[in-house]
């Protein structure tokens, strides 16, 4: 697999999964554009000194103008990988409109706007878009106790499938991965008694994403790929 200096945007690239995705992309020759929330996040990014990493401070990706500025600064975009998001769990009685809108904004609206900008940037050349859904987007009953999160990720999955059909003739392949619980330090702290060995590792999920975004991947569109490990 060779990206050969192809430009790739990775939102959420400074997170645990994002760091693994960026590292894997760098290993196959990509130039990675990583928007960070703050200057401090950019300064702390482990790959910041790699010349093939282009960091920026984008602010809120649910803001259309901010997203358009981000994509306008990337030449000849090949792939856009949308990892930025957030998780909140609460019973519906404790889920007010503010929490619902927060989950929709960080998970669905930000991804929608990035997809929209990516399609515009790829016009006439084709490319790849990879989103991140969740197990709750595919197995609705698993979203009990986190209805706002589950709804936001289900909307993202529907977006992925619908957009894949819309842009297929433009040679833009749109897919998503749907993790269960990824093995990250934060998840281990949150669930100290869980079976960590059953969780998919960040490098394993990253490998799936990098393939879906690659020029070697030619045929799959509209897939929401379960990446559950044994969890």
Segments from the language model and where they lie:
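Conserved NAD(P)H cofactor-binding loop of Rossmann-fold oxidoreductase domains
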Residues: 83-89
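Active-site loop of short-chain dehydrogenase/reductase
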Residues: 6, 76-77, 122-134, 169-172, ...
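Catalytic loop of short-chain dehydrogenase/reductase
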Residues: 128-155, 160-169
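Conserved glycine-rich cofactor-binding loop
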Residues: 14-15
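A short, exposed helix-loop element centered on a Lys and neighboring polar residues
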Residues: 115-116, 161
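C-terminal helical subdomain
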Residues: 169, 176, 184, 194-231
